[in-house]
């Protein structure tokens, strides 16, 4: 997908950001509860039920349920699954697994969207490094989400953070996105590309930034369920995401319970202090989801699992065209 020049990036008022913050806090709370619930033996359907309960108790509704026919409240992607894993009573977690949970909520007509990856019990040190590298890349990208920068600065920061962390596969077929009155809107936010390119970032924009990386290659395959995306080589994956408001003071992380203070002390403290947020209990790293672009699969099975037989879309092209693009 290319970002077309005739498409508009939604600009929010400070009051609208306050309303997005309410939705973001629902997501942040739900993810914290889910991360605490992850344990050997629990099913991904159990986690989905917990998410539905927490979102409903807050007076919100799930962003994902029914979206293009998606059948669940969260995406629960285990091990080689990168994104869009459908919760199932038959998918139970085992010690050493890695699960990525993507969660979205709508409150008062505004969306929040985040994701995180956690280990189930003790995990392989290489898996822990994978999770740490992905989360670090998310925060490096968020640090560049500043009015006056270019969208490519965010993408490049994610890319270089992953590159510096090790030999990881950086997923290109799925991207972050603008967010606000709808879950997926302009602009697409790739996790790679040159700095100084793309739309000029302005105060009032909101971005969902969400790197996805693997311990192997970057190629992906969509399974026959039409949703679950897995690594083509069977390697494990991680996914982190946050919804970020661009303010004159810096990035305000709407899906972090402390607004981002713990991770972005130099910029986020200014932005969060301007909003009057107080730091709560230690935050849980939030998560990711991308617009529904489908990867290509030509075979009928992969690692014993049925996959989609034909392409249903195309990845973001990488040219950060758009309003004010260079």
Question: Which residues fall in each region the model found?
Answer:
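Active-site neighborhoods and metal-handling regions in enzymes and metal-associated proteins
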Residues: 1-326
